[in-house]
């Protein structure tokens, strides 16, 4: 299928059939998320893979008991850094220098510009990083569609409770969104055969 056909195929699956997604497909989706663009390339977030059944149940209880949490194959929790610390920036600069085989000192000017761009309160840092997670989330949704894997993004959960469950606060992290991977239950999910509702091209785009 073409990209547009894949995007027409996908939808926010409400019920899944408990079938496991092959590891190679999950790995491709994860790699797409890793390669997603972010501002400065910082990737100011972590992605937690929930494999423990007890953790999954606790997340389900704090996520409005949405059935996909229990019925899906894979659960990914996106958590953004609350504060862009000097340590995070040091790691980023070292990784850049190593990857591009250049002296880290050659990045001093870039670092100064970077430090100025991300200067701000913890709230501002978290909101900025949270926005970046949505770019990665969207990339993951497209990659899942390409692999014919259903994917449901979830924001309906108690962030404070999820942070506590996963021990995020001591790691300078806060939960942002959840991505469930799996396969649609065409019997139980009434939306599986429903037509996709979107604005028309004319309504969405404004030419100036």
Predicted segments, located by residue:
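Acidic, surface-exposed loops and disordered segments
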Residues: 1-208
């Amino acid at each position: 299928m073409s990209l547009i056909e894949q995007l027409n195929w996908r939808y926010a699956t409400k019920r899944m059939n408990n079938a496991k997604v092959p590891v190679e497909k999950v790995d491709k989706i994860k790699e797409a998320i890793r390669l997603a663009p972010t501002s400065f390339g910082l990737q100011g977030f972590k992605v937690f893979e929930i494999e423990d059944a007890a953790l999954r149940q606790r997340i389900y209880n704090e996520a409005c008991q949405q059935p996909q949490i229990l019925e899906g194959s894979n659960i990914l929790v996106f958590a953004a850094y609350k504060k862009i610390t000097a340590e995070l920036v040091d790691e980023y600069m070292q990784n850049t220098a190593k990857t591009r085989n250049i002296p880290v000192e050659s990045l001093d000017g870039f670092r100064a510009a970077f430090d100025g761009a991300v200067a701000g309160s913890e709230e501002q840092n978290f909101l900025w990083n949270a926005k970046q997670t949505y770019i990665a989330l969207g990339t993951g949704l497209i990659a899942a569609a390409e692999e014919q894997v259903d994917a449901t993004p979830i924001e309906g959960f108690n962030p404070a409770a999820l942070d506590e469950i996963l021990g995020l606060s001591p790691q300078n992290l806060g939960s942002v969104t959840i991505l469930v991977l799996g396969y649609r239950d065409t019997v139980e999910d009434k939306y599986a055969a429903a037509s996709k509702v979107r604005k028309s091209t004319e309504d969405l785009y404004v030419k100036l």
